[in-house]
């Protein structure tokens, strides 16, 4: 198995939760196994996968051991999600970018992203994927969390990244005065958010 993938299988093959790690391969400050164990505690019956970008390049160089670019990753994930009735992509920061990107390309049911980057200025990256506004679709439900305490507009976590894509009717922008996924997890807020998303009707 690739060191870029961690997974826990459930018994319910209707629902798949896919998480994309961000900076230092974590979701916020939560390590992969810890986040997967939390999801398993909340949703023991569902299949769960956690991908890591060891290249730390917004997944543009692929997932090590699996793919080498965005197109290959899309094809790979297309096979992974096939057969599930509900698919949720989750990510934070660069992982949020990946959740939106691949969730859009694959038209998954839902994307949950915390302080995601939606515009990338790095000119070494494939140009058509630098602005997610040009990639997002009209069928996926996007739940995007912005942190209003980040004041520097050049910061990767500035709310301007949410503003860039919030005009889509299928985007729900949620603004918080500080975002800590650890605190959201420990308070039960994160579980409630995910439960409410998964309670939405499946695509026909």
Description of each model-found segment:
Residues 1-46, 55-57, 144:
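Short, surface-exposed "cap/lid" segments of acyl-processing enzymes
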Residues 52-65:
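Cap/lid segment of the alpha/beta-hydrolase catalytic domain
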Residues 79, 102-109, 162-165:
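Short, surface-exposed basic-aromatic patches at helix termini and helix-loop junctions that form
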Residues 83-93:
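Alpha/beta-hydrolase fold nucleophile elbow
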Residues 91-103:
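Glycine-rich nucleophile elbow surrounding the catalytic serine of serine-hydrolase chemistry
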Residues 107-122:
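A conserved short beta-strand
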């Amino acid at each position: 198995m690739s060191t870029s993938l961690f997974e826990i299988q459930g018994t319910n093959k209707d629902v798949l939760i896919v998480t994309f790690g961000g900076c230092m391969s974590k979701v916020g400050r939560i390590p992969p196994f810890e986040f997967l164990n939390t999801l398993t505690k909340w949703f023991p019956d569902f299949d769960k996968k956690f991908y890591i970008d060891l290249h730390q390049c917004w997944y543009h160089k692929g997932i090590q051991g699996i793919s080498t670019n965005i197109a290959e990753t899309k094809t790979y994930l297309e096979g992974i999600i096939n057969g599930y009735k509900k698919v949720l992509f989750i990510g934070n920061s660069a992982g949020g970018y990946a959740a939106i990107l691949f969730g859009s390309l694959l038209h998954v049911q839902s994307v949950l992203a915390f302080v995601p980057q939606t515009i990338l200025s790095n000119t070494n990256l494939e140009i058509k994927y630098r602005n997610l506004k040009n990639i997002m679709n009209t069928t996926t439900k996007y739940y995007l969390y912005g942190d209003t305490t980040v004041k520097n507009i050049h910061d990767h976590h500035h709310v301007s990244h949410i503003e860039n894509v919030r005009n889509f009717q299928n985007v729900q922008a949620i603004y918080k005065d500080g975002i800590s996924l650890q605190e959201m997890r420990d308070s039960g807020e994160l579980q409630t958010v995910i439960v409410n998303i998964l309670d939405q009707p499946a695509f026909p």
